[in-house]
């Protein structure tokens, strides 16, 4: 049996280690494989990265024997400690086979929902993963424009987008993608992609770019938090049933939200919480615990909510 990697938070959530943390993950995060065949400029697992192989984003991952990891996750689900499992699959020659085996093993634990975030290349491969028991599939765009995709990730954004759309049409409401803010796109470019995803029932997990030692982008800065807040607000308003046109621009920047009493509409703070698949909270995935959070993994305090509104800098009507 192979070694799996559990995020440190997951190891705490399933009882494999003791952690002092204000909130444990509600999803069990598993990394399958290491040393990716791709060469994304922001990723610790990239082909040319010199980062330690135990990292993905700023999270450390702990090697665990496969059988032990499956048992701990399954029992934690049965005990109500986690809501689902998420397989973060590194693109390697045997990655598809690893996922198929993992899905087969998780079936031993009944109704445990398993999300697979991987690099399948055809609708038929996606169908096989669903047939094997995946609850949802994630196919990461990461980057908002074809030009940036080619320079940062390599390959064709259009091909990835067309595959994502084809899967969303065949498996409506069961597809997720990740988008990373701060890779050189404008707010308008990111907003356009978010809206196109939402129209197709593709769930968006919004991330803030995180510079990592050993990657090509190690010296780049994280995104402006105000820009990130504005995109979070727009995404939340889509979820609440508002039209995309309520988000207004001057040039490439969001400057106004055309919603009466918009701050009352957003008073629940959900706009600034972690986005993506249901029950995914990703504690401290984008920032250190002492930093102001891009994505809050828990309800915001009144002070945090006030700060997030102020950071956005937008006006309502």
Task: Give residue spans per PLM region.
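N-terminal [4Fe-4S]-dependent radical SAM core
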Residues: 1-63, 72-75, 271, 283-285
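Immediate flanking context of iron-sulfur cluster ligation sites
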Residues: 24-35, 248-275
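Flexible glycine/acidic-rich beta-alpha junction loops that bind and position SAM and/or redox cofactors
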Residues: 147-153, 184-185, 203-228, 241-264
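Catalytic cores of alpha/beta
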Residues: 122-132, 181-200
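Radical SAM enzyme core and accessory elements
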Residues: 1-10, 261-317
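Alpha-helix-loop-beta-strand connector modules within alpha/beta enzyme cores
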Residues: 97-114, 156-174, 224-244
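Conserved strand-turn element in the central/C-terminal portion of the radical SAM core barrel
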Residues: 164-188, 208-209, 214
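Core AdoMet radical
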Residues: 47-96, 107-125, 134-162, 176, ...
């Amino acid at each position: 049996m192979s070694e799996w990697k559990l995020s440190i938070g997951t190891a705490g959530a399933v009882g494999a280690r003791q952690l002092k943390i204000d909130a444990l993950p509600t999803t069990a995060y598993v990394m399958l494989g290491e040393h990716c065949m791709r060469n994304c400029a922001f990723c610790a697992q990239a082909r040319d990265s010199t980062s330690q192989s135990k990292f993905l984003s700023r999270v450390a991952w702990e090697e665990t024997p496969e059988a032990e990891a499956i048992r701990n996750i399954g029992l934690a689900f049965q005990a109500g400690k986690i809501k689902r499992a998420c397989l973060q699959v590194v693109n390697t020659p045997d990655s598809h086979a690893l996922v198929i085996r993992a899905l087969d093993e998780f079936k031993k634990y009944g109704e445990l929902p398993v999300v697979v975030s991987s690099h399948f290349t055809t609708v038929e491969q996606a169908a096989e993963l669903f047939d094997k028991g995946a609850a949802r599939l994630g196919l990461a765009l990461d980057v908002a424009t074809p030009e940036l995709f080619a320079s940062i990730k390599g390959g064709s954004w259009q091909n990835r987008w067309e595959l994502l759309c084809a899967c969303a049409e065949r498996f409506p409401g069961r597809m997720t993608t990740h988008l990373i803010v701060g890779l050189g796109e404008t707010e308008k470019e990111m907003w356009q992609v978010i809206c196109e995803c939402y129209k197709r029932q593709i769930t968006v997990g919004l991330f803030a770019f995180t510079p990592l030692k050993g990657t090509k982008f190690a010296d780049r800065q994280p995104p402006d938090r105000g820009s990130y807040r504005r995109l979070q607000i727009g995404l939340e308003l889509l979820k609440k049933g508002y039209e995309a046109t309520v988000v207004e621009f001057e040039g490439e920047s969001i400057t106004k939200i055309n919603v009466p009493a918009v701050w009352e509409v957003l008073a629940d703070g959900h706009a600034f919480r972690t986005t993506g698949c249901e029950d995914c909270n990703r504690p401290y995935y984008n920032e250190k615990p002492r930093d102001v959070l891009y994505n809050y993994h828990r309800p915001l305090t009144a002070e945090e909510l006030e700060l997030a509104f102020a950071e956005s800098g937008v006006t309502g009507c």
